[in-house]
Amino acid sequence: MPKKDVRAFLYDILENMKDIIDFTNDMTFDEFLKDKKTQKAVIRSLEVIGEAVKNLPEDFINKYPQVPWKGMARLRDKLIHHYFGINYEIIWDIVINKVPNDIKEIEEIIKDIEGEDENSI
């Protein structure tokens, strides 16, 4: 897969992660539980992230093992198919404890890829 295509998926992932942070900014877990619109927006963004991850080539995923790619893809499957319902405590934990770090990792990967492109000119 050309780097351009990989980059498009990475930008999709990054945009949706940043959206999740924006949607839940200054929100408590109790507020999140009461706000169906935010729940649905966060769930949809997590689904899009998982779908984008599924489109990344295996060799690319293996090159960046610091990102929980497979977990993102599995979460998408669970959300899409609603296996055993949605546990909003787990979703909130992902929002608060995983997404901010994943944003940093994805930004670093994008810089890495763009640096490779500059070096190949």
Swiss-Prot record:
Keywords: Hydrolase, Nuclease, Nucleotide-binding, Phosphoprotein, Toxin-antitoxin system
Motif position, RX(4)HXY motif: 76-83
Protein name, as recorded: Putative RNase MJ0127
EC number(s) from the headed UniProt entry: 3.1.-.-
Family: Belongs to the HepT RNase toxin family.
Assembly notes: Homodimer, probably forms a complex with cognate antitoxin MJ0128.
Gene Ontology MF terms: nucleotide binding; RNA nuclease activity
Keyword Hydrolase attached: yes
GO cellular component: toxin-antitoxin complex
InterPro entries (alphabetical): HepT-like (IPR008201), HepT_RNase_toxin (IPR051813)
Pfam families to which the protein is assigned, alphabetical: HepT-like (PF01934)
Cited function: Probable toxic component of a putative type VII toxin-antitoxin (TA) system, probably an RNase. Probably neutralized by cognate antitoxin MJ0128. Neutralization may be due to AMPylation by MJ0128.
TM region(s), chain numbering: none
Residues annotated with O-di-AMP-tyrosine modification: 83
Organism: Methanocaldococcus jannaschii (strain ATCC 43067 / DSM 2661 / JAL-1 / JCM 10045 / NBRC 100440)
Coiled-coil ranges from the UniProt annotation: none
Catalytic residue positions: 76, 81
Protein modification: Modified by cognate antitoxin MJ0128; probably at least 2 successive AMPylation events occur on Tyr-83.
